């Protein structure tokens, strides 16, 4: 930003006197269809890739930044710490408000009961995903550490198993993916709404998913439905089971269940 001089002249001295903004002040007339073609797709891809949808490791960037921060804090083996402490550290990778970061943590916690296999071992009131009346307590009152299952998220992460990139201000680095040892994207449900695209994956039983993956690696013609019967939800429940419908969902990746 321009700074006023200290010599009392009132003139503005700029930090970068040789810098300029290309085409500044020039009004460009073009068809709106051309503008959309040039700008909409890059914007959509940025939202899809960088923010809204889970990657192949099953995590959105906000989840990954939070869990990696907790890993670097030693919360995989150490004792619990205040949630507010984790939220503050996470801002080094995720420059959002503390409320958004804490809400992400709540969803990943055992106390909230959102995930089939929670990633955050929590202590205190984290609310319940199935009740709007049971709100979670403020971050200064709750405590967290990583759940033991996170050992499978970070296994060999310090051995160049995944790529690392600089954070937003180049003060540190963060992983682009987690080297997970099981298909987290199938085990823990994750929803995402992007630009003209959305993702909603049901959670499946961990043992069945691993059994199916091993069988499929050994035999690409393996009948998936013989080992992966259907979704497994954290709150339990009954499903109107239609084998042919499930097969079609497995084949296409599209469909719904009741």
PLM regions and their residue ranges:
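Gly/Lys-enriched N-terminal cap/neck module of very large, oligomeric protein machines
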Residues: 256-258
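Catalytic phosphate-handling regions of large nucleic-acid enzymes and associated NTPases
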Residues: 1-254
């Amino acid at each position: 930003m321009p700074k006023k001089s200290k010599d009392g002249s009132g003139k503005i001295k700029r930090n970068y006197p040789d810098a300029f903004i290309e085409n500044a002040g020039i009004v460009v007339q073009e068809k709106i269809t051309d503008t959309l073609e040039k700008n909409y797709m890059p914007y959509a891809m940025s939202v899809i890739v960088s923010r809204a949808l889970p990657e192949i490791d099953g995590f959105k960037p906000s989840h990954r930044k939070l869990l990696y921060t907790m890993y670097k804090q030693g919360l995989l083996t150490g004792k619990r710490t205040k949630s507010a402490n984790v939220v503050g550290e996470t801002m080094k990778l995720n420059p959002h408000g503390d409320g958004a970061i804490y809400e992400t943590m709540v969803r990943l916690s055992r106390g909230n009961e959102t995930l089939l296999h929670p990633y955050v071992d929590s202590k205190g009131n984290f609310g319940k995903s199935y009740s709007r009346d049971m709100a979670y307590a403020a971050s200064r009152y709750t405590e967290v550490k990583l759940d033991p299952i996170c050992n499978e998220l970070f296994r060999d992460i310090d051995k160049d198993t995944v790529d690392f990139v600089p954070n937003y201000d180049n003060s540190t680095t963060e992983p682009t993916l987690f080297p997970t040892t099981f298909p987290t994207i199938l085990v823990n449900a994750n929803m995402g709404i992007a630009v003209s695209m959305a993702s909603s994956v049901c959670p499946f039983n961990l043992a069945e998913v691993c059994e199916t993956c091993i069988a499929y690696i050994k035999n690409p013609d393996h009948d998936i439905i013989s080992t992966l019967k259907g979704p497994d939800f954290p709150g339990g429940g009954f499903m109107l089971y239609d084998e042919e419908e499930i097969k079609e969902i497995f084949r296409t990746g599209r469909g719904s269940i009741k």
